[in-house]
Amino acid sequence: MKASWDIFCTVVDNFGDVGVTFRLARQLVAEHDMSVRLWVDDLSAFARLCPGADAQALQQWHDGVNVCFWAKDWQPAEPADVVIEAFACHLPGAYIDAMKARNPRPLWLNLEYLSAEEWVTGCHGLPSLQSSGIQKFFFFP
């Protein structure tokens, strides 16, 4: 059975956030045969990057990626095996609760921005125990 991945993306400025996360999602599908759901809070930004995308659709498929609208009023969703919190976005509390209840618990990664600063090497892969009791790991590309 292939692993499932959830990638959460808050569009902050321009299209970098959604562009990087969509590219990562497509690579996980195409190169590693993973099942990937990309949660995006601004589908209009996504639609400008992805020909054929519908900025109004709550769920749509592009290049094998299940692209879902990340609404402020979060609707319950089963957590994936691997969860990526991209670029310091914050997962919905109900999703974190569902992660805590899942057995085994998902691998939770905090994907950070690219940096060439020296301190990055010492922080890459570090665990961070969250108040939920789940470990989150920092990933610096």
Tell me the role of every PLM-derived stretch.
Residues 2-6:
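Extreme N-terminal starter segment of soluble prokaryotic enzymes
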Residues 8-133:
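Active-site and donor-binding regions of nucleotide-sugar-utilizing enzymes
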Residues 136-141:
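A conserved mid-domain beta-alpha-beta active-site/ligand-binding segment of alpha/beta enzyme cores
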